[in-house]
């Protein structure tokens, strides 16, 4: 009875009411590198875009996608990066996917909805590649997984992607001395966009535990030793969260190289381990790098050179300059015995 009462009294908004279509026509074109940070609620959400390509990182914790007011003006979302399995980043993405499914099922209504309103509902960006590390148990939907909000959201994400015909791509880095970039976009005369994966590591203990043994609980003993020597009891989705460094290389050598780090929910030690593998990259050795600066020789700062020159000059001047001679004593002259003429005049007047 309580369920029937709720179904009669509570109205669930449709995907088109939750994510309204744009009010104006045309698409938004982002020509310069930019990064939009959205109010993700308890989670995060950001969009990084360059001229010709964009990447959406996570979607926030609300079903009403916090990024929708901007994204609905784009003709395409080229890539979506889901850093981890969680209720703080998947609901916003699921809201977008649910709307895309509703667009496929939408038919011209014979009721009050006019043809123009029906066509407006179909205006939304196309979806490109989706990066998402998913355990094998979630794909098979085994009943052994514990019921949890994050697991439910991940299952919904997989169901929606399957209906849309999108296969999520895994993302990790191979154990090597250095990290090779993943080319996301390259256009002659415009630039190149690369992505370096810092975490997780392929075939590591964390990834094997996530893919094979993780039962959906928030914290579990992974058998992995932390830097303090104790066995790690940490959230497995956080331990295997994707951390990516996105780098934009413009074609113009005088333009700035843009570097954006998306840490996800990875622990700090995992992020630092990945950054150690990137120490050989020249564009990380400058605070504001350009390809013109990297091509030139490395020169120390001017301030340090002037200080060194001043010290060497002072030492050489001390060696070359003669020692100052002692001042000669000055003889004191005796006062003269003559009377000043003024005294005589003063006496005569008296």
From Swiss-Prot:
Residues 305-350 are annotated as: Disordered. It comes from the Eukaryota. The keyword Membrane applies. It is found in: Endomembrane system. One of its GO terms (cellular component) is neuronal cell body. It is a peripheral membrane protein. GO terms for molecular function: actin binding; microtubule binding. This is Electromotor neuron-associated protein 2.
């Amino acid at each position: 009875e309580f369920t029937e009462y709720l179904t009669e009294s509570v109205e669930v908004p449709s995907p088109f009411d939750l994510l309204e279509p744009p009010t104006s026509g045309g698409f938004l074109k982002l020509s310069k590198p930019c990064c939009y940070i959205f109010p993700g609620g308890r989670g995060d959400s950001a969009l990084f875009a360059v001229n010709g390509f964009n990447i959406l990182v996570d979607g926030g914790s609300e079903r009403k996608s916090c990024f929708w007011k901007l994204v609905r003006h784009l003709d395409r979302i080229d890539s979506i990066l889901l850093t981890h399995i969680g209720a703080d980043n998947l609901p916003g993405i699921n809201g977008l996917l649910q709307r895309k499914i509703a667009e496929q099922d939408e038919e011209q209504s014979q009721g009050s909805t006019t043809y123009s309103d029906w066509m407006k509902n179909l205006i939304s960006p196309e979806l490109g590649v989706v990066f998402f590390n998913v355990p094998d148990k979630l794909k098979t939907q085994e009943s052994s997984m514990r019921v949890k909000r994050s697991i439910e959201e991940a299952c919904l994400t997989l169901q929606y992607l399957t209906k849309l015909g999108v296969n999520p791509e895994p993302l990790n880095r191979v154990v090597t001395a250095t990290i090779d970039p993943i080319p996301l976009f390259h256009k002659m005369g415009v630039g190149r966009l690369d992505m370096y994966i810092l975490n997780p590591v392929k075939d590591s203990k964390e990834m094997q535990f996530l893919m094979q043994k993780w039962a959906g609980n928030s914290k579990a003993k992974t058998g992995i030793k932390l830097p303090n020597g104790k066995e790690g009891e940490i959230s497995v989705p956080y331990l295997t969260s994707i951390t990516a460094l996105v780098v934009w290389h413009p074609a113009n050598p005088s333009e700035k190289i843009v570097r954006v780090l998306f840490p996800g929910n990875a622990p700090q030690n995992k992020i630092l381990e990945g950054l150690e593998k990137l120490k050989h990259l020249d564009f990380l050795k400058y605070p504001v790098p350009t390809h013109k600066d990297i091509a030139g020789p490395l020169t120390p700062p001017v301030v340090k050179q002037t200080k060194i020159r001043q010290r060497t000059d002072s030492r050489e001047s001390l060696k070359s300059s003669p020692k100052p001679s002692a001042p000669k004593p000055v003889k004191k002259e005796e006062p003269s015995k003559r009377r000043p003429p003024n005294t005589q005049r003063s006496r005569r007047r008296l």
